[in-house]
């Protein structure tokens, strides 16, 4: 571990540091949920041919993505407060103007 890692996990670390680590661990724990929900969406279409199940699992998927996205934005804001160069935080992709949920439901309508 680096010196800053030692500081982060030492007894001297502030409650803010501890909270940031907990937030990151919580976000990391949600990543498998995204894959699980996406898999269930595919199964709902392929195996069950159930639009109701697809909607349920796609809602779970989108809620999990939103949770992670919000958490990552908060982490980025915390980094900005720590005077990290903003250039390193700029997204490299353009964001779609159409919400992801609309795209998913449009595609599911085409499949049904």
UniProtKB/Swiss-Prot annotation:
Subunit structure: Component of the Mediator complex, which is composed of at least 21 subunits that form three structurally distinct submodules. The Mediator head module, the middle module, and the tail module. The head and the middle modules interact directly with RNA polymerase II, whereas the elongated tail module interacts with gene-specific regulatory proteins. Med11 is part of the head module. Forms a heterodimer with med22. The med11/22 heterodimer binds to and stabilizes the central head subunit med17.
Known role: Component of the Mediator complex, a coactivator involved in the regulated transcription of nearly all RNA polymerase II-dependent genes. Mediator functions as a bridge to convey information from gene-specific regulatory proteins to the basal RNA polymerase II transcription machinery. Mediator is recruited to promoters by direct interactions with regulatory proteins and serves as a scaffold for the assembly of a functional pre-initiation complex (PIC) with RNA polymerase II and the general transcription factors.
InterPro entries, per database record: Mediator_Med11 (IPR019404)
GO molecular function annotation: transcription coactivator activity
Lineage: Eukaryota, Fungi, Dikarya, Ascomycota, Taphrinomycotina
Residue ranges of the TM segments: none
Keywords: Cytoplasm, Nucleus
One GO CC annotation: mediator complex
Name this polypeptide is given: Mediator of RNA polymerase II transcription subunit 11
Pfam families membership: Med11
Origin species: Schizosaccharomyces pombe (strain 972 / ATCC 24843) (Fission yeast)
Protein's cellular compartments: Cytoplasm; Nucleus
Biological-process GO terms, alphabetical: positive regulation of transcription initiation by RNA polymerase II
Similarity-based family: Belongs to the Mediator complex subunit 11 family.
């Amino acid at each position: 571990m680096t010196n800053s890692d030692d500081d982060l996990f030492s007894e001297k670390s502030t409650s803010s540091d501890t909270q940031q680590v907990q937030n990151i661990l919580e976000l990391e724990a949600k990543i498998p949920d995204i894959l699980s929900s996406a898999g269930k969406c595919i199964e709902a279409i392929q195996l069950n041919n159930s639009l109701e199940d697809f909607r349920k699992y796609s809602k779970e998927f989108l809620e999990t993505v939103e949770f992670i996205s919000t958490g990552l934005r908060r982490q980025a804001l915390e980094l900005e407060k720590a005077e990290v160069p903003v250039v390193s935080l700029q997204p490299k992709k353009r964001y779609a103007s159409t919400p992801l949920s609309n795209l998913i439901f449009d595609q599911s309508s085409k499949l049904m």
